[in-house]
C-alpha cells in the first residue's frame, strides 16, 4: 500500500524523512502493542497492530513524498517489454530477500529443535545485541545505496572501483572496531543486564564476533549488488547460500551445539555467498582482473581487525572495573585502538587517504548544518 513512494525519497537520499515517519509510527505501534498484551492479552491484536502501523507508515510517507516532489505523478502506460523487465527484476529481488530470511531464521529453528528453548532464549539475548549493532551500521549502507547506484551510471569503471575500495576501507574500520567492542563487552554487558546464569561460553562470543565481521563485509558486496541492480545474475546465490547454511546447521549442531550453528552461517557466507557475489559483481560492474586485488585488500583489513581484537582483548584483561564504568572503559579502548592500527598500517594508501578526506568533509558538513 503506497510503499512505492518510498523509492522517490530514497532516490533523492532523503532517508531522514522516512526515519522520522518510522520513528513516529513505531512509537505509536509499541504503545498499542503494549496495550494489546497488557489489557487484552491477545497476540492476534499484537500482530494486527504491526500490520496497521506499516500501512499508516506507507500512507504518511506517500503523502509527504507527493508534497515534496509533486512532479512525480504516475501516468500513461509502460511498454510491454519494460513491464516484463520490471516483473523479472521483482522476481529476482524476491529470491534474494527469501534467501536472507531463510538464513536468519534457520539458526533459531535448528537451535530450538535440537538444543531446546532454554538454550534458544540465551542465544537470542546475544543475537539481539548483535542485530542492534548491525542496525546502527545499516544506516551507513542505506544512506549510500542511492549515491552508489547513481555513480555506477554516471562515472567510469576506474572511479567506481576506487569508490568501492574507499567504502570498503571505511566499513572495515567500523566493523573491526565493533567486533573488538563485542569481543570485550559482550560478557560484561550480559552479566550486568541478565546475570551470569544467562551467559554463554566465551567461545560463543568469538563465534558471534566472526559472524558480525563477515556479515558487514558481505553487506558491502550486497550494497553494490543492489545499487547496480544485478539481481537477475545473482538470483540463485541467496537460495543456494541459505540451503548450504541449513545443511551445515543440521550437521554441525550435532557436534558443536550453538557454536556449530553460528559457524555454519559464517561458513556458508565465506565459502558460498561471498565468492559467488564477488564473481558476479566483478564480471558485471568492474573489471574481472580487479577481483584479486580486492580480495587481497579484504584479507589485509581482516588481518588488521584481528590484530586489533587480540590487542584490545589483552588490554581489556587488565580492566578490573565492574558495571557500567568498566563497560565505558572497554568501549573507549576498543574505539581507539582499532582505528589507530588501521592508520598505522594503511595511512599511505590511496583508499585510506580518500576515506579520511571524505569523513572530514562529512563532519564539516554536519557541523555547518548544525550551526
Model-derived segments and spans:
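Alpha-helical transmembrane segments of polytopic membrane transporters and translocases
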Residues: 55-56, 92, 107-109, 121-138, ...
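Interhelical loop/hinge segments that connect adjacent transmembrane helices in multipass membrane
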Residues: 43-47, 59-105, 109, 147-162, ...
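Interfacial/gating helices of multi-pass transporter permease domains
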Residues: 43-48, 81-89, 111-131, 162, ...
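Helix-loop junctions and terminal segments of transmembrane helices
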Residues: 11, 69-70, 130-168, 222-227
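Helix-terminus/linker motif at the lipid-water interface of multi-pass membrane proteins
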Residues: 35-40, 101-132, 150-151, 187-197, ...
Amino acid at each position: 500500500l503506497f510503499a512505492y513512494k518510498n523509492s522517490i525519497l530514497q532516490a533523492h537520499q532523503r532517508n531522514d524523512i522516512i526515519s522520522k515517519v518510522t520513528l513516529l509510527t513505531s512509537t505509536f505501534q509499541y504503545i498499542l502493542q503494549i496495550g494489546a498484551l497488557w489489557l487484552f492479552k491477545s497476540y492476534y491484536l499484537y500482530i494486527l497492530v504491526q500490520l496497521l502501523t506499516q500501512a499508516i507508515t506507507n500512507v504518511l510517507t506517500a503523502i509527504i513524498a507527493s508534497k515534496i516532489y509533486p512532479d512525480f505523478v504516475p501516468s500513461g502506460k509502460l511498454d510491454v517489454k519494460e513491464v516484463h523487465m520490471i516483473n523479472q527484476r521483482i522476481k529476482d529481488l524476491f529470491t534474494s530477500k527469501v534467501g536472507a530470511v531463510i538464513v536468519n531464521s534457520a539458526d533459531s529453528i535448528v537451535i530450538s529443535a535440537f538444543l531446546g528453548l532454554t538454550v534458544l532464549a540465551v542465544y537470542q539475548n546475544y543475537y539481539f545485541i548483535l542485530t542492534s549493532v548491525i542496525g546502527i551500521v545499516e544506516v551507513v549502507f542505506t544512506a549510500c545505496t542511492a549515491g552508489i547506484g547513481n555513480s555506477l551510471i554516471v562515472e567510469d569503471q576506474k572511479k567506481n572501483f576506487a569508490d568501492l575500495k574507499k567504502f570498503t576501507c571505511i566499513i572495515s574500520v567500523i566493523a573491526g572496531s565493533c567486533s573488538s567492542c563485542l569481543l570485550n563487552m559482550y560478557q560484561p554487558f550480559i552479566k550486568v543486564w541478565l546475570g551470569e546464569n544467562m551467559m554463554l561460553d566465551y567461545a560463543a562470543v568469538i563465534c558471534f564476533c566472526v559472524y558480525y565481521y563477515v556479515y558487514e563485509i558481505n553487506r558491502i558486496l550486497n550494497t553494490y549488488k543492489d545499487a547496480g541492480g544485478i539481481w537477475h545474475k545473482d538470483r540463485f546465490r541467496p537460495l543456494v547460500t541459505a540451503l548450504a547454511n541449513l545443511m551445515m546447521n543440521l550437521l554441525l549442531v550435532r557436534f558443536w551445539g550453538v557454536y556449530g550453528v553460528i559457524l555454519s552461517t559464517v561458513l556458508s557466507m565465506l565459502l558460498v555467498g561471498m565468492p559467488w557475489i564477488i564473481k558476479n559483481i566483478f564480471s558485471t560492474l568492474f573489471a574481472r582482473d580487479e577481483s584479486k586485488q580486492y580480495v587481497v585488500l579484504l584479507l589485509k583489513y581482516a588481518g588488521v581487525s584481528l590484530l586489533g581484537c587480540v590487542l584490545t582483548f589483552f588490554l581489556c584483561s587488565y580492566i578490573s572495573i565492574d558495571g557500567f564504568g568498566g563497560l565505558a572503559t572497554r568501549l573507549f579502548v576498543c574505539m581507539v585502538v582499532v582505528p589507530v592500527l588501521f592508520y598505522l598500517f594503511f595511512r599511505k594508501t590511496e583508499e585510506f587517504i580518500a576515506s579520511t578526506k571524505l569523513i572530514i568533509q562529512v563532519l564539516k558538513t554536519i557541523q555547518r548544518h548544525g550551526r
